[in-house]
Amino acid sequence: DFGDEAHLELDPQIGYTAPVTLGSIHPTADIGMLRYNYVGNSDLNYNEYYFKMIFNALLHQSDSLIPSISYTNNYGGKVTSESMGKDISNWYFNVLYATPISQSDFGANASLGYSKASEEIYGSEAEDHFFDWKIGVTYAYKPMGLLAELAAMGSNLTTGGLSDTNKKGVKTAAVFTLTKSF
């Protein structure tokens, strides 16, 4: 729940990629920063730093496997820091598999993630960790550099006692995402 003021999340990202040689495997390393921005309530904003390894062509020519790790020392921004009386750090581990569907602009993906916070801040029965998952279908509109995704996403967080608004952020739901690449 982003409160009454923030109804949109925009997350710009900046990073650097470089090829890496691991014996006969040639993944790409990606390191960078993501800025979580909640339009209308900047007190929720925070930075997250990440590292990914992108392994392409594992099962066939166009698939990819992307394990990643992310860290923030200020999860939830100023709002969380003030409500907890201190900054909350969070580690996030994820593995994503993506593959095209035939020789089209459609694709499929699946991911499994694990979050671990420095305090018990997640779910209705305050926990310091949880798992999340996603299964999605994508469409790449290459002339404009757009990627549309429709995914089912969920977590193992408990929702008993949460408001309907707060449940939306953690229970299984359909999520549409539109990404623009430059």
Per-segment meaning from a language model:
Residues 1, 18, 33-39, 55-57, ...:
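Transmembrane beta-strands of outer-membrane beta-barrel pores
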Residues 1-5, 38-42, 77-86, 120-126, ...:
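Outer-membrane beta-barrel domain signature
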Residues 2-4, 19-28, 41-43, 57-64, ...:
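Short loop/turn motifs that connect adjacent beta-strands in outer-membrane beta-barrel proteins
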Residues 6-10, 27, 43-49, 87-93, ...:
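Residues that define the transmembrane beta-barrel architecture of outer-membrane proteins
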Residues 10-54:
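Hydrophobic alpha-helical segments and helix pairs
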Residues 12, 27-32, 49, 63-69, ...:
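Transmembrane beta-strands of outer-membrane beta-barrel proteins
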Residues 46-124:
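Detector for outer-membrane/organellar transmembrane beta-barrel domains
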Residues 135, 139-141, 168-182:
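Outer-membrane beta-barrel "beta-signal"
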